[in-house]
Every structure is written in C-alpha cells, then in structure tokens.
Regions:
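ABC transporter nucleotide-binding domains
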Residues: 2-4, 9-207, 211-212
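Solvent-exposed beta-strand sheet faces enriched in polar/charged residues
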Residues: 5, 232, 289-291
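An acidic, carboxylate-rich microenvironment
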Residues: 55, 71, 93, 108, ...
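Short secondary-structure transition/capping segments
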Residues: 71, 119-120, 263, 298-301
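ABC transporter nucleotide-binding domain
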Residues: 172-265
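C-terminal coupling/interaction segments
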Residues: 267-335
Length: 335
C-alpha cells in the first residue's frame, strides 16, 4: 500500500532525503528510526502527499503522490508530532468539522467520533474545549482525527509524544489493533521499546538515506554481528583452560572463572558440539543461554556511526523552507 522508489528531497543544496526505497504492505507496521534531522519527517510528508518530492516516485494505494495528491489525502491518516488543533472548538465539533472536510456523512461522522472517543478514553471530555486538554489528550485527539475516516494507510510521527504511561499504552494497544485491520502503518518514533514492541520491520535512516532495513532479528545480526551466548560451569570449575580447545567452534568474547561468553553463527549445530567437548573434559555446564539484545543496542550502534560520519553543511531556516513549500503546494491545490 505504501511504495517509494528512489524518493528524494532537496532544499537548496541540502539533501534531506536521498533515494530511499520503502514498501509497507497491508497489515504491516514499519518503524522508521533515526537521529534528529535524519529525514524521518520529510519522508512522511512526501509519502503523505504534503511535500512534493524532488525526484523519485511514491505510490499510496496505487496512486501517485504528485499527480494524485488530493485523492491520496483522503486515503491516509496523518499524525504529526505537533497536533495543531483548533483550541477554541470542543472535541466533538472539531472532529465533526474534519469529518465533513473528508466527505463523511453526518451519521458516519457521529458514529466514528463516538467510537474513537470511547476507544481512546476521551468520552468524558468530549464537550470540553481543546485548549483545556493536557498535552497527552491533545495528541490522542490528533490520532482520533487521523482515524476519523477509517483510512487504509496511517502515518504516525511520534504518536505517544507527551503522553503519560497509561495513555501511551492505550495508544500502543490501539495501533496494534489497527495493524490487524490490514492497514499499512508507517511509524516514526524515538521510543525504541515502542518500536521493538509494535514493528514488523524496522528501517533506520541516517543523513537522508536508509542504511538498514529488516526485522529486529535481521538488524541485530547485521549491525551487532552473530548472537552472543553465555555459558556457566558449576563451581569451582574454571573455563579458561578449556578455551583453546574451543577456538575452532566459537569466537570467544570473554572467559573468566565459571563464565564463558562467545559468538556463534550456527547455534543449533555448534552448541551441542561445545557441550560435548566440555563434558569430555568433565566440566559440568549448569546454564547456557543467548544474551538478550535490544533495539537500543542496534540504535546506539547507528548513532555512534552517525557521529563519526561526515555531515552536510547546515542550511539556514531549513524548517521554514519546508513549511513555505508545503504552503505553496496547498495553495496550488486550492486547499
């Protein structure tokens, strides 16, 4: 449902996004991660037909983001980091207004509004002005707005920003349910635990380029190498004398006392051989397990590489340039 081929965006001499290729299938959630300024939001704006690409192509539900921009805007739900609400309106009026802009009839608007306000715990605040909402409540209203027309494609840019833990959990649970409804979802977030929990696949962007794309397991192996295992012997045995006899099987990371840490590319094949060799030396193994690795480990490796990489020179007022371009496109579209 979401396809991008060599999609690029340039502001003057600054390349914000460089020839990225992406695909998000129905029922899939792809998390787009990267440092600040990596190109995440620019990518979302282009895919959402808000910002025109400089080159390359993208299609949403088979529609081109340039030639079919107005049609696409009716098929996507977009949640940005900053909600941009009309604070003087009450919640129900606000949602009814946006539903009418999207062409929903009165009965559908009312039904969708009631359903979503209850789902996100905002029912009791439905007649309050949005100015009186907390930051977390405003973000939830913005998510309801993105879902009001039941779109097949969702772009979620930092959806749980400023939310308390309970509200964030409510939103994460809802996102999981939305994915099960065969929606294609692109999520950008700095919450690595959230991405690890929700994403089917993860793309990591740096300097406007996708530098890694795959499942968490695939990225862990690609960026962190083969998995690490930890083996412990019974006290008082010592692992060190046995290490030379294991060198052809494993790559030793650390060996001290009763504990051995090692990398192993084919654990189902190698670990039984390893245990057999230790047993032959009368070294009793009391524990053997893979050392857990998190998405944070993967992300920190990327950030470390980013810090060492050459940077493009900064462009003054880059955000203003982007905002002006978006405004010009909306004027041209007569919106």
């Amino acid at each position: 449902m979401i396809e991008a081929h060599r999609l690029s965006k340039q502001f003057g001499t600054f390349h914000a996004v460089r020839a990225i290729d992406l695909e998000v299938r129905p029922g899939e959630l792809l998390a787009l991660l990267g440092p600040n300024g990596a190109g995440k939001t620019t990518t979302v704006r282009m895919l959402g037909a808000i910002l025109r690409p400089s080159s390359g192509s993208a299609r949403i539900c088979g529609l081109d983001v340039v030639t079919d921009a107005q049609t696409i805007r009716g098929k996507v739900g977009l949640l940005t980091e900053y909600p941009g609400l009309y604070g003087r309106m009450i919640a129900t009026e606000y949602l009814d207004f946006f539903g009418s802009l999207l062409g929903l009839d009165v009965a559908t608007r009312e039904a969708r509004t009631d359903l979503l306000l209850q789902q996100f715990g905002l029912w009791d605040a439905r007649e309050r002005k949005l100015d009186g909402y907390s930051k977390g409540m405003k973000q939830k209203i913005a998510l309801v707005r993105a879902l009001i027309h039941d779109p097949p494609v969702l772009f979620l840019d930092e959806p749980t920003t400023a939310m308390d833990p309970q509200s964030a959990r409510t939103v994460r649970d809802a996102i999981g349910e939305l994915r099960q409804a065969d929606r294609a979802i692109l999520l950008t977030t700095h919450n690595l635990a959230e991405a690890e929990l929700l994403a089917d696949r993860i793309a990591i962007i740096r300097g406007g380029q996708i530098i890694a794309l795959g499942t968490f397991a695939e990225l862990s192996r690609q960026l962190l190498g083969a998995p690490i295992y930890e083996l412990r012997l019974a006290v008082p045995h010592n692992i060190a004398p046995a290490v030379p006899a294991l060198a052809d099987l494993i790559t030793v990371e650390d060996a001290s006392g009763q504990t051995l840490r090692y990398r192993c590319t084919e654990p189902n094949l190698i670990n039984p051989q390893l245990l057999a060799r230790l047993a032959a030396r009368n070294l009793p193994v009391v524990a053997l397990a893979e050392v857990p690795r998190s998405l944070e480990d993967v992300y920190l490796r990327i950030v470390a590489e980013d810090a060492a990489a050459p940077k493009q020179p900064p462009v003054p007022h880059q955000e203003a340039l982007a905002a002006n371009e978006v405004l010009q496109q909306l004027i041209e579209a007569d919106l």
